[in-house]
Amino acid sequence: IGNIPIANTKIMPYGWRKAAKGRTVWRIVEEVISQGLESRVKQLGFDSVHAADSEVGVFDFRFCYDGNKESYVNIKSAVLGGRTNKDDISKAVRLIDFYKKNPSANLYIATFVISFNDDMTIGLDKCIVFPTAWIPDVYVNPSNNGNLQSSMYKNLRTATKRTPQEFLVVLEQANQVAL
């Protein structure tokens, strides 16, 4: 995909300043990734790629590859060199509903590590793909609208390998604690 142009030094002569944050550009990054995959389905070897119908669902796009079942991807962004925080993954109740309707679904978090370049572009430096069901630190934050949060979803070495149904049990327990 290459760097994503956001602005230029004519309209932002002092650079990024306080705008150099993931929350400033995450939606654009999400769209660039989704549309880039959709427009290059065959070229990239996918059977199909479809954007999510809802902007507030648990995934941003779904895809099929090599005749296998459909998989789902939730796109996140993280700033290169940023500190490790508990980040919002999705609303716990929406994830619970999703896994109840799709008990064997492959749902992934694809985190694009981004950098803010002097030429007012966003660099896509790295992509980390992590199965949602493998999140080791399952925590539902009651003071943050019941969001599933994790600080370890960007490190596969910390993964707790489990099936979607095993994850559903853990998530439901964490959600009960949060209520």
Regions found by a protein language model. Give the residues of each.
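Nucleic-acid endonuclease domains
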Residues: 1-57, 65, 71, 77-179
